[in-house]
């Protein structure tokens, strides 16, 4: 089947998806059919970043923890143009030990070397994009993707994730305690465990303990991912 044939099938699969797992399976299948290893949906609204992806867990922690969205060349290019585009980390300008050089090297080490990105301008100045990435030097389908279908795909992912988030109901074991919620709220505001301890009067180790319990309940591998999940579920 052609790339656009696979794209049409993907849109149908997304419309039938009942949960995030089904969305992830559909996107991963399409990525592999086009020669890519991973996918990433990203929504940036001011300083807030929300993601849904198949990238390695450690990469998300590094990306969000280091505020790499402020220097990410793919994000920068997506703001300048509104069409599907190909990118490669090998073309990013980077010298010495600059943050951009570190970003490029870490991206490549996590299997993100080239890709194709579908960008769309959202409401109130927000931006959304869907990327398919590969560890290879060049895997480019940007020239054969139907632009209208590509945008339709991105919007389908966006709204399906919103619908699923709205339907998500935490079971009793996932309910956060008042102290866990308190520490989570401060974490969502960018406060470290030590700063939260000073603000709340709770011991710093205890703050970390509450965050660890919240991570376990929401199946998050890191505090940045915990905050992202909590925002998606409307908890903070």
Swiss-Prot record:
DNA-binding region: 193-212
Coiled-coil regions, chain positions: none
GO BP annotations, alphabetical order: quorum sensing; regulation of DNA-templated transcription
Molecular function via GO: DNA binding
CDD domains, A to Z: LuxR_C_like
A Pfam short name: Autoind_bind
InterPro entries for this protein: Sig_transdc_resp-reg_C-effctor (IPR016032), TF_LuxR_autoind-bd_dom (IPR005143), TF_LuxR_autoind-bd_dom_sf (IPR036693), Tscrpt_reg_LuxR_C (IPR000792), WH-like_DNA-bd_sf (IPR036388)
Domain named HTH luxR-type: residues: 169-234
Function: Positive regulation of conjugal transfer. TraR activates target genes in the presence of AAI and also activates traR and traI themselves.
Family note: Belongs to the autoinducer-regulated transcriptional regulatory protein family.
Name of the molecule in the record: Probable transcriptional activator protein TraR
Native species: Sinorhizobium fredii (strain NBRC 101917 / NGR234)
């Amino acid at each position: 089947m052609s790339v656009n044939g696979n794209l049409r099938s993907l849109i149908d699969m997304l419309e039938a998806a009942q949960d995030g797992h089904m969305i992830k399976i559909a996107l991963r299948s399409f990525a592999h059919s086009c020669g890519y290893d991973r996918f990433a949906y990203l929504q940036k609204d001011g300083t807030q970043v929300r993601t849904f992806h198949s990238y390695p867990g450690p990469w998300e922690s590094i990306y969000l923890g280091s505020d790499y969205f402020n220097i990410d060349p793919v994000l920068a290019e997506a703001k300048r143009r509104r069409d599907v585009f190909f990118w490669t980390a090998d073309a990013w300008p980077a010298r010495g030990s600059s943050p951009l050089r570190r970003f490029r090297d870490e991206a490549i080490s996590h299997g993100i070397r080239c890709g194709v990105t579908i960008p769309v301008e959202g409401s109130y100045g927000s931006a959304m994009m869907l990327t398919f990435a590969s560890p290879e030097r060049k895997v480019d389908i940007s020239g054969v993707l139907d632009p209208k279908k590509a945008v339709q795909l991105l919007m389908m992912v966006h709204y399906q994730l919103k619908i699923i988030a709205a339907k998500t109901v935490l079971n009793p074991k996932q309910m956060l305690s008042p102290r866990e919620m308190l520490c989570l709220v401060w974490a969502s505001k960018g406060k470290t465990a030590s700063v939260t301890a000073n603000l709340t009067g709770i011991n710093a180790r205890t703050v970390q303990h509450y965050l660890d319990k919240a991570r376990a309940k929401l199946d998050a591998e890191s505090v940045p991912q915990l905050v992202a999940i909590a925002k998606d579920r409307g908890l903070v």
